[in-house]
Amino acid sequence: MNPGIDLEQRFVETLMELGLTPGVAKTIWLPIPMLLMIIGATVGVLVSVWLERKISAAAQQRIGPEYIGPLGILAPVADGIKLVFKEDIVPANTDPWLFTLGPILVVIPVFFSYLIVPFGQNILITDLGIGIFFWIALSSIAPIGLLMAGYSSNNKYSLLGGLRAAAQSISYEIPLALAVLAVVMMSNSLSTIDIVNQQSGYGILGWNVIRQPIGFMLFWIAALAECERLPFDLPEAEEELVAGYQTEYAGMKFALFYLGSYVNLVLSSILVAVLYFGGWDLPIPATMIADWINVDPNNAIFELVTAGLGLVMTLLKAYFFLFLAILLRWTVPRVRIDQLLDFGWKFLLPVGLVNLLLTAGLKLAFPFAFGG
C-alpha cells in the first residue's frame, strides 16, 4: 500500500524550517483541516446551487441567474438570506415537536458524515478506523426525520411524501452498503484514508472503478436515490405531491431540508471520487512526474505541491459527478413508485450480492490485484 503524502508532517517541517518550534507548528496545523471541511461544505452547497441553476437554464435555452453578482454567483447567498428572514409558520393541528425535529434529524447526520471525508491526504477532521460504517450508520437516520416531517404536518401530501422517502431510502440503502462492502473487502479497511491509499501509486490504473465497474454503477445509482435526485425524486414530486414532506414547511425549517439535500449531493459526489476514482490520487503517479522533471519524490516542496494538486483533483472529480447529477435532472423521466421499489429490490439488491461474491472470488484468485 502506498503510504501517500503526510501533509501534516510536511507542513510542520516547513514551519520548523522557518524557525517555529514543533509544538507551535502542530498547534497551527490543528484547526486547518476543520476549517477546510466547514468552508468546503459551505462553498460546495453554494456552488452546487449556482451550477444547478446555470446548467438547468442552459438545458432550457435560458440565461439563468445573471444580475446578483458576476454571472449570478451570489444568487444562492441571496436565497439563504431570504429564507433566514422568512416567517417560520407552524400550521394548526400539527405536532410541533415532531414538526421541528424532522428537518433537524435530516440535516445533522449529513454534516456529521463530513467527519470522515478526506479532501486530500490528511485533510480531514478525523481518520476513523470505522469511517465507512460510521457514514452508513448516519445515513440511516435520515428516513426517521423524513417520516417525522411527513407525519407531523397533518397533510395528506406530506404524509405520502414522507412514506415514499422512507421506503426509497430503506430500499436503496442496502445496495449502497453492498457496493461499499466490495470496496472495503479489497482495501481490507473501513477507513477512507486507507481506501484511497490502496488505490494510489499506479495512477488511473489503480483506481477502484477499473476493478469495480459494477460496484461503481451500483453505488452511483443508489446514491442518486438516497439524494432524491431525478429520476428518483418521488418523495417531493411537484406534479403529484406539491412538495412532498416539505409542503407545510417555511422559513428556516424549509431551508434545512434545502440545505441537507445539496450537502448530501456534494457528499455523495465526493464519496464517489474517494471510493472509486482514487480521491486525491493523480491520474499519473507522482513518482513518474518526479522522474520526468528530475526531482526527488521525497522533496518536501514537491510533496506539498503534489498534495495541493491532490486537493484540486478531489474537487474536480466530485464536481464532475455533481454536474452529471444535475444533467440527469433534465435528461431522464421520473419513475413510478412501483418501478422504483422493483428496481431497488429485484435488480440492484441481487446485483449487489453477486458483485460482492464476485469480488470475494477474485480476491482469492488474484490477491495481488484485489487486495488479498
From Swiss-Prot:
An example GO biological process term is: photosynthesis, light reaction
Q: How does it sit in the membrane?
A: Multi-pass membrane protein
List the catalysed reactions: a plastoquinone + NADH + (n+1) H(+)(in) = a plastoquinol + NAD(+) + n H(+)(out); a plastoquinone + NADPH + (n+1) H(+)(in) = a plastoquinol + NADP(+) + n H(+)(out)
Could you name the Gene Ontology cellular component terms for this entry? plasma membrane-derived thylakoid membrane
Keywords attached to this Swiss-Prot or TrEMBL record, sorted alphabetically, are:
Membrane, NAD, NADP, Plastoquinone, Quinone, Thylakoid, Translocase, Transmembrane, Transmembrane helix
Q: Return the EC number.
A: 7.1.1.-
Group of enzyme by EC: translocase
Molecular function via GO: NADH dehydrogenase activity; oxidoreductase activity, acting on NAD(P)H, quinone or similar compound as acceptor; quinone binding
**Location relative to the cell:** Cellular thylakoid membrane
The membrane spanning regions, by residue number, are 27-47, 65-85, 97-117, 128-148, 176-196, 204-224, 249-269, 308-328, 351-371
Looking up Pfam families in the UniProt record yields: NADHdh
UniProt xrefs under PROSITE patterns: COMPLEX1_ND1_1, COMPLEX1_ND1_2
Which protein family is it in?
Belongs to the complex I subunit 1 family.
- How does the annotation summarize its subunit structure? NDH-1 is composed of at least 11 different subunits.
| Protein's job | NDH-1 shuttles electrons from an unknown electron donor, via FMN and iron-sulfur (Fe-S) centers, to quinones in the respiratory and/or the photosynthetic chain. The immediate electron acceptor for the enzyme in this species is believed to be plastoquinone. Couples the redox reaction to proton translocation, and thus conserves the redox energy in a proton gradient.
Name of the protein in question: NAD(P)H-quinone oxidoreductase subunit 1
Species name: Acaryochloris marina (strain MBIC 11017)
